[in-house]
Regions:
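A conserved catalytic-loop motif detector
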Residues: 200-261
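Conserved catalytic neighborhood of penicillin-recognizing serine enzymes
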Residues: 136-185
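Active-site-proximal beta-strand/loop segments in catalytic clefts of secreted hydrolases
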Residues: 101-103, 154-158, 166-170, 183, ...
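Sec-dependent bacterial lipoprotein signal peptides
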Residues: 1-28
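Mid-domain, small-residue-enriched loop/turn segments at the edges of structured enzyme/sensor domains
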Residues: 95, 166-221
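Structured C-terminal helix/loop/strand segments within mature extracytoplasmic catalytic/sensor domains
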Residues: 5-6, 29-58, 62-86, 90-92, ...
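Short, conserved catalytic-motif segment at the N-terminal edge
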Residues: 91-117
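Active-site SXXK
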Residues: 106, 117-141, 154, 282
Length: 323
C-alpha cells in the first residue's frame, strides 16, 4: 500500500494525464509526454550518500548530571544540599546534631552528631505542650481557658514563667512519665544550682529525640491538636525566627527554638517543619562548647535550614537574646 502522500501524488498525476487524453481526443489525437513528476528512476540523478561523521567530529550529547550519593529516597537535589550542609558544618563552632526527615518518602538523614545528647533548652516546651494537649483530650487532665492561654504564650514567645506555671501545676511525674511516648526516649534530667531534677529547663537529649517529637506531632496527634500546634509554631514571635525558620516564607516553616547557657557554653536549638503540607521535619541541636555565642549558634542552625530548603545561605539573623 502506498503512503498517503505518495498515493495523493499518483492520483494528481493520473488526473493530469486523463485531462490531457481528453484534450487530445478533442483535437483529433496527439502524443502524451511524460510529466516531470513521472520521471523514471533510471533517468533521475543518482543520490550520493553523505559521508559518515568521524567520531571526533560529532557533537557530544551532554549526559545528565549524576545523582549525588546520599541517603536513599531523597531527591537528587536534596542529596546535593545535604552534602553542602555537611561541608558547611565542618567550619562552624561547636557540635551540631542534625536530623532531616521527608514525611512523603520516609527518607531520613542523620549527621554524625545526631545521637549526641545536648541540653534541650526551650525545645522541651514543645514536649510539654504535646503532653498537656494529648492528655487533656484523653480526659486525664483538664486544661482551663487560662491554662490554654499560658500554654500558647509558652510556645509563642517561649515564656519561661509560663513553662514553670504548667510544670509545677501538673507535676514533674506527669511529664516524665509521658515524654518517652512522644519521642523523648533518651531524655535525661540533670542537676543545676538551685534546681532539683526533674525540671523542664534542665533536660538533655539528642537531635534524634527532637526529630521523633516533631514527627509525633505531625503523624500521630489527632487532627485538631496537630492543626493547633502547626498554626502556633508557624506564627511564633520574631525572636523565634531562626533555625528552621531559615527555610523561608515560601516553604511555610514552623518551629520551636531554644537557647541557654550551660556548662558547655551556649546552646542553640531548633525543631520544626517546612515544605508543602509540612513535608519535611528538621531537628538541630548546637552545643557551641565555648567557641561562640548566641549569634554564632543562631546563624549556624539558620543557614543549615536555608541551604536545605533554599539551596543557599541567607543573611544571618539579627535578633538578640539574653540567657
Amino acid at each position: 500500500m502506498l503512503p498517503a502522500v505518495a498515493l495523493g501524488s499518483a492520483v494528481k498525476v493520473a488526473a493530469r494525464r486523463g485531462a490531457a487524453a481528453v484534450a487530445c481526443a478533442a483535437l483529433g489525437g496527439c502524443s502524451l509526454l511524460s510529466s516531470p513528476a513521472a520521471t523514471s528512476p533510471a533517468s533521475a540523478p543518482a543520490s550520493v550518500p553523505a559521508p559518515a561523521p568521524s567520531p571526533g567530529s560529532a557533537a557530544a550529547t551532554p549526559s545528565p548530571p549524576a545523582c549525588p550519593a546520599g541517603p536513599a529516597k531523597f531527591t537528587c537535589g536534596m542529596r546535593a544540599r545535604i552534602a553542602e550542609v555537611v561541608a558547611y558544618l565542618k567550619h562552624r563552632p561547636g557540635v551540631v546534631g542534625v536530623v532531616l526527615r521527608d514525611r512523603s518518602t520516609g527518607a531520613v538523614w542523620e549527621n554524625r552528631f545526631a545521637h549526641i545528647p545536648v541540653y534541650m533548652a526551650s525545645t522541651s516546651k514543645l514536649a510539654m505542650a504535646v503532653a498537656l494537649l494529648t492528655q487533656n483530650q484523653a480526659g486525664v487532665i483538664h486544661l482551663s481557658s487560662g491554662d490554654m492561654s499560658v500554654l500558647h504564650e509558652m510556645l509563642h514567645v517561649s515564656s519561661d514563667t509560663d513553662a514553670d506555671t504548667l510544670w509545677f501545676k501538673f507535676g514533674a511525674s506527669f511529664y516524665t512519665g509521658f515524654f518517652p511516648r512522644i519521642g523523648l526516649a533518651s531524655a535525661q534530667y540533670v542537676s543545676a544550682p538551685g534546681i532539683t531534677p526533674p525540671y523542664w529547663g534542665e533536660m538533655i537529649c539528642p537531635a534524634t529525640d527532637l526529630s521523633r517529637l516533631i514527627t509525633y506531632v505531625l503523624d500521630d496527634m489527632p487532627a485538631s491538636l496537630r492543626g493547633y500546634l502547626v498554626a502556633t509554631l508557624s506564627h511564633v514571635a520574631t525572636d523565634q525566627h531562626f533555625g528552621v525558620w531559615g527555610a523561608g516564607s515560601a516553604n511555610h516553616p514552623g518551629n520551636k527554638d531554644g537557647w541557654s547557657v550551660e556548662k558547655p557554653g551556649w546552646i542553640i536549638n531548633s525543631v520544626g517543619f517546612a515544605g508543602p503540607g509540612q513535608r519535611y521535619t528538621l531537628a538541630m541541636m548546637n552545643s557551641l562548647n565555648g567557641h561562640g555565642g548566641y549569634h554564632a549558634g543562631t546563624d549556624t542552625v539558620t543557614q543549615v535550614s536555608a541551604i536545605l530548603f533554599r539551596g543557599h545561605q541567607v543573611q544571618a539573623p539579627t535578633i538578640s537574646a539574653t540567657p
